[in-house]
């Protein structure tokens, strides 16, 4: 049975924040705090998206009225999964239990 690297994206809402850098730091910190006891082997990074006009990479964060929406990328190695779908189910289960009400979407699955 092969191993897989599953990449999920999540959306975090941060209130009472002034700058985008603060929002990103708080979102990564909150995600790490929730994941640490149960799934400390999950890598957390700021989500990136490509500008449709200039094709440059941009942070997935927006601050409006002291409220931020931050996109995070969560990567997890899943060992000995039966298939890609099985690896996704395992990753969503482990990360979803730790993060509870945070929406998760599959971004990428790679066989290792």
Curated annotation (Swiss-Prot):
Short name of any one Pfam family annotated for the protein: DUF555
InterPro entries: UPF0212 (IPR007564)
NCBIfam families recorded: PRK03922.1
Lineage, opening ranks: Archaea, Methanobacteriati, Methanobacteriota, Stenosarchaea group, Methanomicrobia
Family label: Belongs to the UPF0212 family.
Protein name: UPF0212 protein Mpal_1084
């Amino acid at each position: 049975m092969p191993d897989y690297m599953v990449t999920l994206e999540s959306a975090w809402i941060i209130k009472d924040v002034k700058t985008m850098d603060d929002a990103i730091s708080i979102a990564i910190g909150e995600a790490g705090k929730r994941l640490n006891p149960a799934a400390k082997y999950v890598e957390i990074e700021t989500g990136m998206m490509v500008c449709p006009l200039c094709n440059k990479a941009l942070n997935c964060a927006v601050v409006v009225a002291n409220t931020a929406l931050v996109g995070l990328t969560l990567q997890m190695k899943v060992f000995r999964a039966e298939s890609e779908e099985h690896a996704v189910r395992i990753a969503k289960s482990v990360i979803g239990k730790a993060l509870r009400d945070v929406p998760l979407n599959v971004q990428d699955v790679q066989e290792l």
